[in-house]
Amino acid sequence: MSLLEATLFRGASGVVALHLVDEAVVDRPAGTGVSDHWSVLVLAGAVVAVAVVYPRLPSTGRALLGFIFVPLAGAGAAMHVMDARWNGAHGSDFTGFLLIPAAAAFVAAAVLAVLSRPRARSWPWRIGRWLLTAVVALLLLAFVSLPIAVGVAQTRKPGRSVPESAFATPHQTVTLHTRDGLDLSGWYVPSKNRAAIVVVHGGGGDRRGSRRHAAMLVRHGYGVLLYDARGRGESEGSPNAQGWTWQTDVSAALDFLSQRKDVDQGRIGGLGLSTGADVLLEAGANDPRLKAVVLDGSTSRSLADVRRLKTSDAISGIPYWAVAYGTIAALDQSLPGEPLVDLARKLAPKPALFIASNELGEPVVNRKYAAAYGNPRALWRVDAGHTRGLTEHPQEYERRVIRFFDNSL
């Protein structure tokens, strides 16, 4: 092994470990302590340990390690570059940018490891070994590196400021207090018809992603509460794009609406988008304060969901999602709730409207949810992108959703 190869791998590993420590200690989410991120520090230690033993490994092992680390560093870098593009560089974004040269260094180290094998063997033997290494590397990429990268990205995205000007509808700025001690930032538009809707955004964004839906409801007199889930936007806490920890947030939103003098307690509904739909499906099944729910873009959020769906795509994806969900569970120190199909069964007879787009397998999974709910007619399939029904079919979307809430609340 050359000194250059060792330097490249160890230097890149040091950057990864530095970034993990930066996120877990220096730039950790508001409302959390270092102890809440011990699993990230363990991961940083594991990266350092791999770098220490790296020179002792055979060339094949070194090459595979390099290829495994490439997507991990690359995904982290891409996340911070995109976030900085939309929100401006902040905090751990700066060490996140260093992951770009780190990913390139891992590629270079892997190539050097492949080329460093003894040349005494014949060319056919060497080509065969290279091909075998490539096949194993691709398998590890598909079923280890990429799902781990997905899991890391869904638990590490930092919060960002949300300007008041982002929501043109006249509103009040409010703070929700969760039962586990976090403060969540939100906007509230008082009700004119004694009914109110809590709107829950998708896993990859914040309350700005549900502004158009909120404005639609306001036009028809509904009070609307939209807020940043924990770890998103301006809210405290650690992010979890699968929404496993969001039930306490919804409960805080319902606490807020239950105390409003402009809202009748029996007239509180919910509208969830993507992950927000999964979260409101669970909340609707378990919280009697929520009287009706619109679930726009539910998919799946756990390995149990994937197994229970029993579709060919779901079954083939089990190895991938087992690693991705396992990574999320380890880093966020949380677990998903009941399978969504079971929650759909528990949701009945509470009024529900399932909305499925043409993407992410939504038609298949939502047919199963509506069937478990006991009313296949509760499903509306809209010819649009994921949660883009209101954008691509505004009149029909507004008519269906408002009619549903008018009849249910």
Each PLM stretch: what is its role?
Residues 203-216, 229, 236, 365:
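The serine-hydrolase catalytic nucleophile loop
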Residues 194-202:
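Short beta-strand element of the alpha/beta-hydrolase
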Residues 347-348, 353-356:
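Short beta-strand/loop motif that positions the catalytic acidic residue
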Residues 209, 240-261:
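Alpha/beta-hydrolase active-site loop
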